Amino acid sequence: MKYIVMQDAFFVVLLLVLAVPLGIYMYKVMIGEKVFLSRVLEPVERFGYRLMGVSEVGMSAKRYAVSVLAFSAVGFVFVMAVLMLQGFLPLNPEGMKGLSFSLAFNTAASFVSNTNWQAYSGEAALSYFSQSIGLTVQNFVSAATGIAVLFAVIRGFIWKKQKTIGNFWQDLFRVTLYILLPLSLILALLLVSQGVVQSFADYSVVETLENGAKQLIPLGPAASQIAIKQLGTNGGGFFGANSAFPFENPSSFTNLIEMLAILLIPVALVVMFGRAVKDSKQGRAIMTAMMIVFVIGVVAITISEQFAGPHYQGVATSGSMEGKEVRFGVGGSSLFAASTTAASNGAVNAMHDSLTPLGGLVPMFFMQLGEVVFGGVGSGLYGMIGFIILTVFIAGLLVGRTPEYLGKKIEPYDMKMVCLLILVPPLLTLFGTAVAVMMPSVQASVSASGAHGFSEVLYAFTSMGNNNGSAFAGFAADTTFTNMVGAVMMLLARFIPLVAALYLAQNMAGKSSVAASSGTLSTKNGMFIGLLIGVVVLVGALSFLPALALGPIADFFTTFK
């Protein structure tokens, strides 16, 4: 246990050390300031703008939102076409056939919405062309879209009496060129150096040591996709077993760098926020609130997996190892599970369905909080800003003052947008779960009975309704109902809060700042951090406690039989 504590502490310290300079760098990218890569990338940037016919004129929230939706719609159609027609496309050495309409629809919606829910196994269903040209490209642009929208939201708070919130095409291109591509290149090279595959060769047939049996070894351009799947909080694995598969995550070192990659940009964006609003204490307050909830979750999962699993007389074990890789152990698996669900990533290095009841409850609850404990790149922080405004509003009601945040007064219109930001994901999750449990096809998809069977359904629709993408593997997802309903849920959960955030940003940008007074609520001290954590957890608890009581909580009490 001491080793696990030291490992987790080292991870958090290293994460913060890396995130601070990256956050400062991203702030310079956001405001268009020159960075050390400018000499190399500026000509590429100018050429890209000319090629796309992009002007640098600012956009209103409506125009920004239309641009996001149109760009995402084109990506959706392109990915769906690639998946259904992959049998006729190149880079298909294994002769993979096109996906069914419902599965292609679900997969396209999943990757366009930055969810990466996978109702298929990559090595058995997709060609190299589909993986690299279809899905990997969407991993980049869906992540860049989230960060671009966050840029617009931040401008809403730092600009005064403006009618625009930036230019989507410029934000999208700069994020991709200056942030995602360089980081992905570095991470991909690191992964390849450690044995992660990157090849367009045919699958290999090898003779095993047991009876000389033949085994097919899948290959592919995995490292390049894994790099952006982690950095962009996408999470979709090149192989079906995701980061539990040795070709994706072969060692403890790759496990460390993949976990760092999951949280690096979300944490750095908080640093960037503090720099952008010219008050680093604001960023530190948000970081502290997120980190407290995250650390509590890591501790809860680790203790549950280390001590709450089955014990057998005379057998010395290092915790519950069912569904876990020996090379990662309880510590590496628990930290990964917390990171991937706190950050809206969804990649897994252990099977979450095999976690103990309380060990599975924490990742589920992280998602149900709205993916704001770091959350997805961009979307996590603008979701947390929604909770901050809600907290300020509640505190203002308690003392009878007009609430304000960063010098901007909070008005009824702002609260309407915040409600859309906060309430859409839980409504989709609970509605989807309620409908699903009544469907015979979903009932047949569940591998377990009783409380754990309900947990499998609840986890699946929580994951899709909050754009995470992880799953309890006992849930058979490739059915027409789950594919179609899940796709609609993922798209709504992504784009309704996104559009609400843009309109919130424009309304804020049009206001002038008000001077802080002695009665202004401080949003950077310990009291506010406690209030913010309380509001985030309370909204999650009120929304999901009845469902959790029927699922993982009831599952926990069945272990005492």
UniProtKB/Swiss-Prot annotation:
The lineage of its organism: Bacteria, Bacillati, Bacillota, Bacilli, Bacillales. Keywords: Cell membrane, Ion transport, Membrane, Potassium, Potassium transport, Transmembrane, Transmembrane helix, Transport. Pfam families: KdpA. Part of the high-affinity ATP-driven potassium transport (or Kdp) system, which catalyzes the hydrolysis of ATP coupled with the electrogenic transport of potassium into the cytoplasm. This subunit binds the extracellular potassium ions and delivers the ions to the membrane domain of KdpB through an intramembrane tunnel. One of its GO terms (molecular function) is P-type potassium transmembrane transporter activity. It is found in: Cell membrane. It comes from Listeria monocytogenes serotype 4b (strain CLIP80459). The chain crosses the membrane at residues 4-24, 65-85, 133-153, 177-197, 253-273, 285-305, 380-400, 417-437, 484-504, 528-548. This is Potassium-transporting ATPase potassium-binding subunit. The system is composed of three essential subunits: KdpA, KdpB and KdpC. InterPro entries: KdpA (IPR004623). It comes from the Bacteria. Belongs to the KdpA family. Its main location: membrane.
